[in-house]
Design a protein with these regions (language model features):
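N-terminal glycine-rich FAD/FM-binding segment characteristic of electron-transfer flavoproteins
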Residues: 1-200
């Protein structure tokens, strides 16, 4: 979405950030290949909770001074849906969550978000934190020439320990387990048989 805004002339620069092990650079290179201008990799080898991620991002935001920060609404590993909200609180910025459509204005951003009752339109002043829903856009595929160009774009690496942030976990994970296996279903020949089985 940031790249689309840049292509429309409303945004000057797109910076892609990833926090994690060395393999996190792959995500940044993909972002550079589809149009981001530069990347920042904050290297940390241990698991970081959403609050720790938000603290790291706050440091980067204070250095880069963007007008907007786009994040996914939740991570695929822990599904927490907390980082964007925590970042907005730490920065004391307005936030727009679960965004499925964006309209950037002069000093504000209007977003559409999906809620239980339908679609809600919200406008927040800039600078702002925006968390994005999957419906916001279709992922782009990078062409081979753009993949090659991405290798020449700047990718800064920062060690998380240099930021002076406490990223120690506040939550103790006791265990993770798969859900119990379901019993096999019963096939029925027709609706009448199904009704009988449901009655009994």
């Amino acid at each position: 979405e940031s790249v689309k805004l840049k292509e429309s002339g409303k945004v000057k620069e797109v910076v892609a950030i990833s926090i994690g092990e060395d393999k996190a650079q792959e995500s940044i290179r993909k972002a550079l290949a589809v149009g981001a201008d530069k990347g920042i990799h904050v290297k940390i080898d241990s698991y970081v909770e959403p609050l720790g991620i938000a603290k790291i991002l706050k440091k980067i935001v204070e250095k880069e001074k963007p007008d907007m920060v786009f994040l996914g609404k939740q991570a695929i590993d822990d599904d927490c849906n907390q980082t964007g909200q925590m970042l907005a609180a730490l920065l004391n910025w307005p936030q727009a969550t679960f965004t499925s459509k964006v309209n950037l204005k002069d000093k504000s951003i209007e977003i559409i978000r999906e809620i239980d009752e339908g679609l809600e339109t919200v406008e927040v002043n800039l600078p702002a934190v925006v968390t994005c829903d999957l419906r916001l856009n279709e992922p782009r595929f990078a062409s081979l020439p753009n993949i090659m160009k991405a290798k020449k774009k700047p990718l800064e690496q920062i060690d998380a320990s240099e930021l002076g942030i406490d990223t120690k976990p506040r939550i103790e994970q006791i265990k993770v387990e798969e859900p119990p296996k379901r019993k096999a279903g019963i096939k029925v020949a027709n609706v009448e048989e199904l009704v009988q089985k449901l009655k009994n």
